Amino acid sequence: MREKVYLKFEEMPKVYYNVLADLPFELDPPLDPETNKPISPEKLLAIFPEPLLEQEVSKERFIPIPEPVLKEYAVYRPTPLVRATFLEEYLRTRTKIYYKYEGVSPTGSHKVNTAIAQAYYNKIAGTKTLVTETGAGQWGSALSYAGQKFGLDVRIFMVKVSYQQKPFRKILMNLFGGDVQPSPSNLTQIGRQFSEDHPGTLGIAISEAIHTVLNEKDAKYSLGSVLNHVLLHQTIIGLEMKKQLEIIGIKPDIIVACHGGGSNFGGSALPFIPDVLSGKNIKIVAVEPESCPSLTKGEYRYDFGDTAGLTPLMKMYTLGKDFVPPAIHAGGLRYHGASPIVSKLYHERLIDAASVTQEEVFEAGKLFAKLEGIVPAPESAHAIAYVIKEAKKGDKESIVFTLSGHGYFDLNAYINQ
């Protein structure tokens, strides 16, 4: 029989986990680029609502999930933990492989977890319009869905290469009421600085979104990754995963998730950091593209989160704000930087990181689709590629990874491989 672990809604976590409460060190604060001193909350209020800024700096271990957010989560959560038995048999490995499947969400990825929370907190703060960026379109789809749930207008700058590669993502965003523009665009002074054939980057799209917010009343910026409060909302993944593993008596040797800005990886990994700190033998691995290796080849220093330098300076692993990654199909991982939390954990060697090639990614994705019956998003297939390498060794009892989304909007990528 297929081994699947489902939680009842009543068993779903009713709180988010804040890893900042348990870390034995402080994060370096975001800096105001004008003064190189810690940025004032007043400046951040120009782009973020107060409730989310409070979460950004909170040291409370657990943050209650509001009832309206839980109500929306009930549409698709808790998500299943599944044993990949067909993959195990194919690899002839003694290692048990489990995956936490986030592709059952309304838009097909983990991004909805924070989109719903951010839409709710913006709504109660009086925001009328949310402006954001998106790479592969997963985040833009999620925020469009969440925005219409809470009566907010949503405007999206989508990285141009992904806008061209993934036309059905645009249709989905439009279906949920989102207004989507390719970035660089001619709508902002920042976008107009780039040539028409520029592929775009998440850094440029972020700049265009923030520029729009700063020039529009009742609009706030919404980010789908990197920031503390985003990873906080995503910890519902790891908290559920922990409960599900306890039910079947599995103590994972390795926990794996793909890494771009850090939302999926952080959400999966952070609830297990207390176990690492207490000395338990768990290896936690962030897997990124070889062509955009922020953690494995980046520098740990202060840098802007966007190309134009409109964000505060953040201490993180970075390839540089002007880095233009190749036009790979995993658009959600084409980011020059990384979450400050994930960066600090990696710097302190509490987590590991690895990179894989696009060829390895699509080989793994195709294999997983044939064996397990789910076409993984190219981003998620990075984790699968790493898991396959590790499972072939056969020296671990169990590996758990997060399948952060399905790839049914990314089939063009599979055709071209």
UniProtKB/Swiss-Prot annotation:
<dbReference type="Pfam" id="PF00291">
    <property type="entry name" value="PALP"/>
</dbReference>
<keyword id="KW-0456">Lyase</keyword>
<keyword id="KW-0822">Tryptophan biosynthesis</keyword>
<dbReference type="InterPro" id="IPR023026">
    <property type="entry name" value="Trp_synth_beta/beta-like"/>
</dbReference>
<keyword id="KW-0663">Pyridoxal phosphate</keyword>
<comment type="similarity">
    <text>Belongs to the TrpB family.</text>
</comment>
<keyword id="KW-0057">Aromatic amino acid biosynthesis</keyword>
<dbReference type="InterPro" id="IPR001926">
    <property type="entry name" value="TrpB-like_PALP"/>
</dbReference>
<dbReference type="GO" id="GO:0030170">
    <property type="term" value="F:pyridoxal phosphate binding"/>
</dbReference>
<dbReference type="InterPro" id="IPR006316">
    <property type="entry name" value="Trp_synth_b-like"/>
</dbReference>
<comment type="subunit">
    <text>Tetramer of two alpha and two beta chains.</text>
</comment>
<dbReference type="InterPro" id="IPR006653">
    <property type="entry name" value="Trp_synth_b_CS"/>
</dbReference>
<keyword id="KW-0028">Amino-acid biosynthesis</keyword>
<dbReference type="GO" id="GO:0004834">
    <property type="term" value="F:tryptophan synthase activity"/>
</dbReference>
<dbReference type="InterPro" id="IPR006654">
    <property type="entry name" value="Trp_synth_beta"/>
</dbReference>
<comment type="function">
    <text>The beta subunit is responsible for the synthesis of L-tryptophan from indole and L-serine.</text>
</comment>
<protein>
    <recommendedName>
        <fullName>Tryptophan synthase beta chain</fullName>
        <ecNumber>4.2.1.20</ecNumber>
    </recommendedName>
</protein>
<dbReference type="InterPro" id="IPR036052">
    <property type="entry name" value="TrpB-like_PALP_sf"/>
</dbReference>
<comment type="pathway">
    <text>Amino-acid biosynthesis; L-tryptophan biosynthesis; L-tryptophan from chorismate: step 5/5.</text>
</comment>
<dbReference type="GO" id="GO:0005737">
    <property type="term" value="C:cytoplasm"/>
</dbReference>
<dbReference type="GO" id="GO:0052684">
    <property type="term" value="F:L-serine hydro-lyase (adding indole, L-tryptophan-forming) activity"/>
</dbReference>
<feature type="modified residue" description="N6-(pyridoxal phosphate)lysine">
    <location>
        <position position="111"/>
    </location>
</feature>
